[in-house]
Amino acid sequence: MRKTSSFERSGRVAPVYRGEKRKTSGPLAVRLIMTAATTLGCALSGWSQAAPQLPDDNGKETVQKACASCHSLATVINAGHNQQGWNSVVHMMVNAGAPVPKEQMATVIEYLTKYFPEKPAPEAVVIPGSVEVSIKEWQVPTPGSRPHDPAYAPDGSVWYTGQMANVLGRFDPETDQFKEYPLKTPDSGPHGLLPDKDGNIWFTANFKAYIGKLDPKTGDVTEYPMPDSRARDPHTLIFAPNGNIYFTVQGGNMVGRLNPKTGEVKVVSSPTPKSNPYGMAVNSKGIPFFVEFGSNKVASLDPDTLSIHEYVLPHVDSRPRRVAITPDDAIWYTDYSRGYLGRLDSATGKVSEWASPGGPRSRPYGITAVDDMLWYSESNTRPNTVVRFDPKTEKFQTWIIPSGGGVVRNMVHTPEGNLWLACSGVNGIAFVEVKNAAKISSRN
């Protein structure tokens, strides 16, 4: 049964789905399985073990050179976009330093569109349950900004990284007003972000190799450059209880630490080559954990020495992308390549897995933990879904994102247990209000 809620999206009523299990499909405003340039460049290189060959045609040599500068050509073979999608991906690659001459970009886009077209996406699967939610969405002010990550600030505002517009955005849910803050370095590619207790917003400049701090009161941005030229693309960042910021460097294959008091930045390489450190979270003991999107591994980082301990996941094709930690210090990750939700017990190394409702091509992505409940997105279903998993009952419940989502890359929760999503491909943000479930905040 399909019901509608009373919320509005751009002046229109948007649906909330409840009732019996059903499959639903619908057009997306923009269908981009778009990644930050280094994500396209590095993340999926392990999916195909065979050495692929590109078709002979104009653009082949440039594609081969540009893609091989960061990743296996299997990435291109496994990818698929329409012309608009490849246009966005190629521009992101160039922003991140891929060697594609400006005069050859049109040829490269035409080549990729011709030989690696968009692939059919799996239909979203709606699983009913007892929890009720409503979903409200907003378009961000700058077209084509592609919000990548959201963050919830102590004053109740919601922030997002406008990655392709070179802005940080602030949204006030009380007034429905947006304000965007331009960054001083062009094409910084803001990616991850988080607020501090003083109201500053810290972010990673994925295209320009620095971590930034925005003072919303003045608009001033302080930049902390990476100390190693290989650390070209800082990705996800977190605060630890000791006050330091820890972060991943995806294509640079590193993780690092920034001391906000001194400005000192240190980076170390991942033990596994091309492991592409991606999502990161911190446990109750103050130990950062991160997932390796280029390998089948989860890793912990000693906050003092920066030594790394890796945990090998049982399936060789696993590619964990984002991570969340529940109060029992269980490590939960979205297995993007296989369509699974995974749980790692770091004390024993035991791994448990559950197939995501949307199937092996659903591409689970952004994830957060609200107390012991897991919430995540399926980024490749049509439309995208919000998924809730109860570890005690091992049951899923899912909801469709009315706009389609257009690849929900990350999500955060509020102290009340509601969710904010960054809907990259449809250029928006979304609020998921959880109406009738226990909503206890987990650690940030």
Which role does the model predict for each range below?
Residues 143-155, 186-198, 229-242, 272-288, ...:
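Beta-rich, blade/repeat-based domains predominating
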Residues 406-444:
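Blade-level signature of beta-propeller repeat domains, shared across WD40, Kelch, NHL, RCC1
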Residues 158-164, 201-207, 245-251, 288-294, ...:
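Conserved beta-strand positions in repeat-built beta-propeller and related beta-rich domains
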Residues 172-176, 215-219, 259-263, 302-306, ...:
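Short loop/turn segments that connect beta-strands within beta-propeller blades
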Residues 126-144:
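A short helix->beta-strand "capping" segment at the edge of beta-propeller domains
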